[in-house]
């Protein structure tokens, strides 16, 4: 474990493989293992095994149908975090209405920031966080990366204005995608956060989200 820096605990909220998790554990004080659910499959026994192994676990729904979001929230929110990663605004809105814990990178594969003022206000009201993920940027060409950062800045402006919970994560699927605290803080600054806001997105807000599972 990394150990608190000047009394601050840093949390990596979205790690998606064993090898990435093991590396992230060295760099962060707490790590959430994010289990990508196969399409349409919510296996209670498999989830129990993962929770027993990793402790803090997020069920991550990739481009889900609303019915799967509803099932995940109803059956599993008591013991797991629920994340939704989708560029479909209908799914994003439904997920926020259902009270998932976080929406991850809704701007991915879109030509806008993936949320608007209405959704940002709703996220504040429902306590739904916005996850700013580094991983998609790693595989983009310079033009695509510049556009993605532009949309992330617009999303951050809404998050900041409406006081939406937030976190920054590598969302790593392999150990070479894992990034440390300083690099994730740098991402926050690149999208318009002040340093203290970027640190809070790796500490204060993640710890608040994890508090629900205690």
Swiss-Prot record:
Record Pfam families: RNase_P_p30
Keywords for this protein: Cytoplasm, Endonuclease, Hydrolase, Nuclease, tRNA processing
Alphabetical list of Gene3D superfamilies matching this protein: Metal-dependent hydrolases (3.20.20.140)
Catalysed conversion reaction = Endonucleolytic cleavage of RNA, removing 5'-extranucleotides from tRNA precursor
One Gene Ontology term from the biological process aspect of the record: tRNA 5'-leader removal
* Coiled-coil residue spans: none
Q: Which molecular function terms from Gene Ontology are attached?
A: ribonuclease P activity
Give the matching InterPro entries: Pol/histidinol_Pase-like (IPR016195), RNase_P_comp-3_arc (IPR023539), RNase_P_p30 (IPR002738)
Q: Which GO terms describe its cellular component?
A: cytoplasm; ribonuclease P complex
Enumerate the subcellular locations listed in this protein's record, separating them with semicolons: Cytoplasm
Specify the enzyme's EC class, one word. Answer: hydrolase
Enzyme nomenclature, EC number? 3.1.26.5
Top-rank lineage group of the source organism: Archaea
- Family, per entry: Belongs to the eukaryotic/archaeal RNase P protein component 3 family.
Task: Tell me how this protein assembles.
Answer: Consists of a catalytic RNA component and at least 4-5 protein subunits. Forms a subcomplex with Rnp2 which stimulates the catalytic RNA.
Query: Briefly, what is this protein's role?
Result: Part of ribonuclease P, a protein complex that generates mature tRNA molecules by cleaving their 5'-ends. The RNA is catalytic, but its KM for pre-tRNA is 170-fold decreased in the presence of the 4 known protein subunits (Rnp1-4). The protein subunits also decrease the amount of Mg(2+) needed for activity.
Q: What is this protein called?
A: Ribonuclease P protein component 3
């Amino acid at each position: 474990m990394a150990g608190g820096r000047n009394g601050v605990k840093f949390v990596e909220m979205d790690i998606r493989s064993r090898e990435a998790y093991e590396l992230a554990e060295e760099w962060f004080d707490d790590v959430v293992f994010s289990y990508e659910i196969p399409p349409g499959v919510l296996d209670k026994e498999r989830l129990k095994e993962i929770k027993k192994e990793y402790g803090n676990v997020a069920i991550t729904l990739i481009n889900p149908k609303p019915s799967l979001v509803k099932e995940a929230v109803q059956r599993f929110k008591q013991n797991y975090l629920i994340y939704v990663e989708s560029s479909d605004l209908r799914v994003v809105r439904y997920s926020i209405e259902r009270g998932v814990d976080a929406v991850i990178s809704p701007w991915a594969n879109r030509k806008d920031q993936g949320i608007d003022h209405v959704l940002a206000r709703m996220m504040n009201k429902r306590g739904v966080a916005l996850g700013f993920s580094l991983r998609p940027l790693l595989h983009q060409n310079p033009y695509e990366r510049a556009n993605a950062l532009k949309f992330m800045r617009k999303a951050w402006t809404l998050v900041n204005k409406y006081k939406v919970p937030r976190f920054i994560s590598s969302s790593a699927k392999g150990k070479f995608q894992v990034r440390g605290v300083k690099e994730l803080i740098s991402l926050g600054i690149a999208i318009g956060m002040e340093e203290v806001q970027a640190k809070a997105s790796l500490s204060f807000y993640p710890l608040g989200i994890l508090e629900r599972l205690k």
